[in-house]
């Protein structure tokens, strides 16, 4: 099976810099158009709230704009935080988006992990797993066209049925965000796909293979064939003509990006080069790491290339080198 490659846009904003939010939005839209022209599989858009950590609070709005600018590339939420939203509204919104895109929508979902977002939504972190599981089950059934009545722990309805279904009545592919190998196992056992960012979930590059193995172990326990699985591993990426040039171009932007990450551990440029959980470097360096991922059994890599207000021409140059010079070396 071919190794698929995509783009993940986290949409981090830095108010102290000259780039405005409208300018960031324009850059993101141009980068999606470029991704389509270069053959990237999917353009994923993050959801975040109440902080410059990410300034797209509703991926459906951004993805709707991208529907109008593209024809072929798949468009994904990464992720829709089901914990914070009414499941009926989520199902309606993304069914309509999938219909408008002609079936190109990819549904990344998660439960959230940032304390300030739970505070802003007056949501209890201790309830997030139960709330997520309840909402995901409802959203999936609504997208499938079922007429539902329910009395849940977190919501209820006498009767709900979508009046707009996804394209051709097909439920979009669903990916569940995970931050730990134990979660990867359970997602696999529940017959879901995983979406993960190894920066936040793995201790080093080889640990990516460990997480993938846990996911496949869960699938096996559910009686699913491993060679049928699908998953997304997202890696920070910058490709240049040499390793030194890559560092010169993106180190400052990457470290600025890391400064706004609200993780317990923050890996600066030197750290992420040392632990290997990135795709920074020359065409040869990045191609070698992509081959290692392929040999681990990874099937789908999302590249996070716009971070820290990196100059858009450098983002686009990296995207082009990755697609035109790195990927042909992987076959």
Regions found by a protein language model. Name each.
Residues 7-9, 37, 126-161, 204-299, ...:
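An alpha-helical appendage that flanks or caps ligand/catalytic pockets
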Residues 1-75, 172:
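N-terminal beta1-alpha1-beta2 module of alpha/beta enzyme domains
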Residues 35, 39, 47, 66, ...:
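Conserved, mostly hydrophobic/aromatic
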Residues 1-3, 89-192, 206-213, 221:
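Internal, glycine-rich beta/alpha segment that forms the wall or movable "lid"
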């Amino acid at each position: 099976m071919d190794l698929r490659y995509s783009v993940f846009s986290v949409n981090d904003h830095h108010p102290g810099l000259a780039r405005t939010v409208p300018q960031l939005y324009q850059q993101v839209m141009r980068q999606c158009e470029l991704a389509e022209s270069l053959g990237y599989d999917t353009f994923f858009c993050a959801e975040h709230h109440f902080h410059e950590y990410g300034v797209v609070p509703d991926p459906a709005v951004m993805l709707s704009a991208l529907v109008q600018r593209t024809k072929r590339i798949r468009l994904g939420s990464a992720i829709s935080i089901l914990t914070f939203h009414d499941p009926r509204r989520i199902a309606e919104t993304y069914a309509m988006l999938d219909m408008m895109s002609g079936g190109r929508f990819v549904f990344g979902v998660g439960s959230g992990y940032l304390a300030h977002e739970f505070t802003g939504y007056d949501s209890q972190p201790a309830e997030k797993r139960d709330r997520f599981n309840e909402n995901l089950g409802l959203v999936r059934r609504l997208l499938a066209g079922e007429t539902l009545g329910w009395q849940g722990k977190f919501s209820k309805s006498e009767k709900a049925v979508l009046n707009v279904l996804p394209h051709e009545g097909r439920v979009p592919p669903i990916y569940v965000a995970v931050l730990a190998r134990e979660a990867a196992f359970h997602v696999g056992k529940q017959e879901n796909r995983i979406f993960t960012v190894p920066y936040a979930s793995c201790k080093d590059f080889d640990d990516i293979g460990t997480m993938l193995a846990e996911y496949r172990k869960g699938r096996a326990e559910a009686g699913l064939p491993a060679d049928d699985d699908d998953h997304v591993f997202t890696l920070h990426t910058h490709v240049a003509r040499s390793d030194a040039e890559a560092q010169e171009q993106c180190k400052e932007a990457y470290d600025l990006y890391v400064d706004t990450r609200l993780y317990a551990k923050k890996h600066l440029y030197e750290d992420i080069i040392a632990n290997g959980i990135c795709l920074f470097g020359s065409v040869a360096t990045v191609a070698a790491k992509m081959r290692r991922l392929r040999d681990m059994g990874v099937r789908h890599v999302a590249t996070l290339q716009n971070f820290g207000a990196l100059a858009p021409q450098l983002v686009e140059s990296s995207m082009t080198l990755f697609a035109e010079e790195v990927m042909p070396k992987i076959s």
